[in-house]
């Protein structure tokens, strides 16, 4: 009850007067629009057509034509931090999201939990009569909360959303996603062979959610937070969509930048004098070193296009084609939502906001990858091996990412990419369309704004004041400002004065058209922060940050540096953390349970996430499955952990017991029984005995399989050093509900065991082994 009871209560109801107002469902302000909040992932400034890009996005064009294109809107440079701003209207460090939620370090600025004093826009609107829906990527809860034993307080349904369908982590396989429906994991409705793709699936659910409520209360507005996995790696696209771009990127990434900058100038997106930043603005790793000689990160480098052999160019062209297909395909799915809103008479009264969470990603490094799990496991990508996948790139057979050259291209004209406080990391697409509320159509806006400014804009447009208390928590002030003033005033001066940036030790500050920025890579011992070299740019006229004016205006630079410290203190930006990923990974964190020697798993349960599943890396292990085989026989998956990009499985096929260990997707190690599995009760086992390590962290040994106590097969195998998956692909009993560990399973998805699995017991021996370097690579690729 949010309002006091104003009726009369006496002994007899006949002498009492009711008051229903405190007990009524909340009602939205009269005429409040629907809100469709679309968040692209890792889509740089120069990928989509409304921003001069060469990737076809007709739905984005449609929204730009019916609304406004903002050229000077900014993010934090990373996923969870930006999404926290988009949800609360507060800075990322105020939200406890200085980095991705998995990299929490136990301080107010970096703990992986948005405080309840910083309510989400969904929490605010639910209490004001909106239906609230979340589709797609969340990435706003700590890793130890992404499981069925955890509290759901930081899941979407715990932070104001009435319905949720998507995934909780940083990325997912688009063909076999880690699906959660409301508060429980579910399996996808069909297989890729039957036409499944995550972008289409969440669109189907989005339409279902809208129709469910509108059929009952058509006047009740909705707030929908729609966050596809596109275009974060893996870049998974239906082949026919990727093939639309055959030959379109043959010019290479450097020529792409030139073509797109010319288009951007023609479209009035950037000043006519905007220069194109160098392809390696920080220099090569050999050229750029710390004060004591440490080289700059080797992954943060672009190979000049004209130095590449033709075969390498061929691979990189196809990687761009697949990425473009992924983007266009998802744009098409978003178009289905826009079409429905128009057909049902709702589009004019829907505020549509489209953003990306950061710049294009350079995490593919100079060479890109066909299987990112290779990088996470320290296995070098081979051009010869990658070329074998050229024709199936983007299919379920690959887990791919383009090279960093395309990240620079899709961030044109800016320098660097995601994670950097240069504009390549933080200046990102923003479209706003609201036909009933914005008179201007198809115009460009250049006012400087930030992700924190969208929540106050939504509140302004819906006629709702920021609440002082939400769910009993007194609220911290919203830190952003409304952008509504700019809707019909193209020349209005920005009402934002200052914005601070901090990400993994790299810092920036913008104030009244000027920006100071310093690069500080996350390398242990790179330098003391006092040794950082600050640069100065007049970004009002130099959008690409090509002209460093630090030497020309030293006093202005010092003022901005001082302002950075003031703003960082104001928004709890300390401590700064420039440690390596390995050091961040080893920070002690709360755990759901302590590691143990024995794990017991049951069928007909939710998939166990990789982070909570038994760790068998570089150690001996034994799995024993208690099963019941009917007289007619049985087949299917008994136990599966991981996927075709790394994992192991125990299954029955053609009456025989089989064990497969898939080494990072490179090769399968299969051991089959010499005898058939009998009917009745049996124990089916696979026991690995570690005999050595070669190379380090790669265990070598003997794997034996047993039916009851009889050894029925044996062979030597090697186990991979890192996790089975970068994200998702956990542990299942009685089926394999995600990407299959092997293509040898009998039957069809999800390859269920047709007998009965009572339980599977996994015993592990020896010390828990974690290859910190590999774990760190995997963590950073998830951001």
Task: List where the protein language model places each region.
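Short, intrinsically disordered/low-complexity patches at protein termini
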Residues: 94-95, 105-106, 285, 385, ...
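Extracellular glycan-associated modules
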Residues: 575-783
């Amino acid at each position: 009850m949010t309002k006091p009871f104003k009726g009369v209560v006496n002994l007899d109801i006949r002498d009492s007067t009711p008051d229903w107002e405190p007990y009524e469902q909340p009602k939205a302000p009269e005429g409040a629009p629907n809100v469709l909040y679309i968040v692209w992932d890792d889509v740089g400034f120069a990928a989509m057509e409304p921003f001069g890009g060469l990737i076809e996005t007709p739905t984005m064009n449609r929204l730009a034509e019916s609304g406004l294109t903002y050229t000077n809107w900014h993010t934090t440079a990373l996923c969870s931090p930006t999404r926290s701003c988009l949800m609360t209207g507060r800075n990322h460090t105020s939200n406890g999201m200085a980095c991705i939620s998995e990299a929490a370090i136990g301080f107010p600025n970096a703990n992986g939990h948005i405080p309840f004093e910083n309510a989400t826009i969904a929490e605010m609107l639910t209490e004001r009569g909106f239906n609230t829906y979340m589709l797609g990527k969340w990435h706003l809860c700590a890793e130890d909360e992404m499981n069925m034993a955890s509290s759901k307080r930081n899941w979407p349904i715990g932070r104001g959303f009435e319905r949720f369908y998507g995934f909780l982590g940083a990325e997912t396989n688009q063909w076999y996603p880690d699906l959660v429906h409301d508060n429980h994991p579910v399996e996808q409705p069909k297989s890729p062979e039957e036409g499944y793709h995550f972008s289409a699936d969440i669109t189907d659910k989005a339409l279902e959610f809208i129709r469910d409520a509108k059929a009952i209360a058509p006047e009740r507005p909705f707030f929908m937070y729609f966050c596809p996995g596109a275009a974060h790696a893996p870049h998974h696209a239906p082949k026919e969509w990727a093939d639309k771009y055959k030959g379109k990127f043959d010019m290479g990434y450097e020529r792409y930048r030139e073509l797109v900058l010319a288009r951007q100038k023609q479209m009035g997106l950037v000043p006519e004098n905007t220069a194109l930043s160098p392809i390696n603005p920080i220099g090569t790793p050999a050229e750029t070193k710390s004060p004591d000689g440490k080289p700059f990160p080797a992954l943060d480098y672009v190979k000049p296009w004209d130095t590449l052999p033709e075969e390498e160019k061929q691979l990189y062209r196809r990687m761009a084609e697949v990425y473009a297909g992924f983007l266009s395909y998802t744009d098409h799915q978003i178009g289905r939502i826009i079409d429905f809103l128009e057909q049902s008479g709702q589009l004019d009264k829907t505020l549509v906001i489209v953003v990306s969470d950061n710049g294009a990603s350079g995490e593919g490094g100079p060479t890109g990858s066909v299987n990112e799990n290779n990088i996470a496991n320290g296995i070098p990508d081979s051009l010869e091996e990658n070329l074998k996948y050229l024709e199936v790139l983007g299919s379920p057979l690959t887990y791919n990412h383009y090279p960093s050259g395309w990240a620079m291209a899709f961030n044109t004209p800016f320098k660097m990419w995601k994670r950097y406080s240069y504009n390549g990391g933080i200046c990102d697409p923003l479209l706003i369309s609201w036909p009933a509320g914005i008179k201007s159509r198809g115009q460009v806006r250049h006012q400087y704004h930030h992700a924190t400014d969208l929540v106050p804009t939504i509140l302004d447009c819906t006629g709702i004041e920021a609440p002082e208390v939400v769910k009993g928590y007194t609220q911290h002030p919203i830190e952003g400002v409304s952008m509504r003033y700019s809707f019909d005033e193209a020349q209005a001066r920005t009402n934002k004065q200052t914005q601070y940036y901090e990400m993994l030790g790299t810092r920036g500050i913008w104030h009244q058209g000027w920006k100071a920025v310093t690069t500080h890579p996350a390398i242990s011992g790179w330098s003391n922060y006092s040794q950082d070299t600050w640069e100065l740019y007049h970004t009002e006229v130099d959008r690409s940050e090509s002209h460093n004016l630090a030497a020309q205006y030293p006093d202005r630079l010092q003022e901005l540096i001082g302002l950075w410290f003031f703003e960082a203190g104001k928004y709890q930006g300390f401590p700064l953390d420039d440690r390596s990923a390995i050091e961040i990974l080893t920070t002690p964190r709360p755990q759901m349970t302590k590691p143990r020697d024995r794990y017991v798993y049951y069928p007909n349960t939710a998939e166990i996430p990789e982070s909570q599943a038994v760790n068998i890396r570089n150690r001996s292990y034994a799995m024993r499955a208690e099963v019941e085989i009917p007289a007619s026989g049985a087949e299917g998956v008994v136990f599966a952990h991981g996927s075709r990009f790394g994992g192991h499985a125990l299954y029955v096929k053609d009456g025989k017991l089989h064990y497969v260990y898939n080494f990072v997707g490179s090769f399968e190690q299969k051991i089959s029984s010499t005898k058939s599995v009998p009917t009745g009760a049996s124990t089916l086992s696979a026991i690995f005995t570690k005999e050595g390590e070669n190379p380090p962290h790669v265990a070598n040994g003997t794997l034996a399989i047993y039916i009851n106590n009889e050894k029925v097969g044996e062979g030597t195998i090697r186990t991979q050093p890192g996790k089975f998956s970068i994200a998702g692909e956990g542990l299942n009993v009685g089926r394999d509900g995600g990407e299959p560990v092997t293509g040898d399973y009998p039957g069809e998805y999800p390859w269920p065991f047709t007998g009965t699995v009572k339980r599977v017991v996994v015993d592990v021996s020896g010390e828990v082994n974690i290859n910190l370097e590999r774990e760190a690579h995997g963590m950073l690729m998830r951001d």
